[in-house]
């Protein structure tokens, strides 16, 4: 995720802890493009926990998922609400897997593959190395894009997504 000034997001990590000490983790984010929603999103997360999950059996993730969907989406599902539902759903499945001492994929029918592809973004403005040059608007310098792409493939990424649209406030 790019820095906030480039249009990135604010991440929220959800930690659910059961009365038996099991911990489940989930995550969600709100895009900074939604402007000013950071604090209200945090309140939505807290309120959703209180309304739909607090005091409920975490070993019933499907029941709780449908409870959240019915209670949060009403007639219209949106990005923010489904991000919250997804974060709690992930945390609940994490708890179930720990309770039964098995990976979640076993609970969902077994492993489908033994590895997955990972991709990354290349935004219009890139830092070539930890202390290195920052390149703005690589669309004007394709050799920079080629060099960075090769480095990312060497790091293990098998897919690259190029975003030439300026992300910085000053237009790149």
Regions found by a protein language model. Name each.
Residues 91, 103-104, 144-148:
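Short alpha-helical segments and helix-capping/turn motifs at coil-helix boundaries
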Residues 17-99:
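Metal- or metallocofactor-binding catalytic centers and their adjacent structured scaffolds
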Residues 68, 98, 102-116:
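N-terminal amphipathic alpha-helix/helix-capping segment at the start of soluble metabolic enzymes
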Residues 2, 80-82, 136-138:
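A generic structural signal for short
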Residues 2-4, 106-108, 149-151:
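A generic local secondary-structure boundary/capping motif
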Residues 115, 119-172:
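Metal-dependent enolase-superfamily TIM-barrel catalytic cores that perform enediolate-based chemistry
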Residues 13-15, 25, 159-161:
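Structured core elements
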Residues 1-15:
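Short, Gly/Pro- and small/polar-rich lid/capping loops
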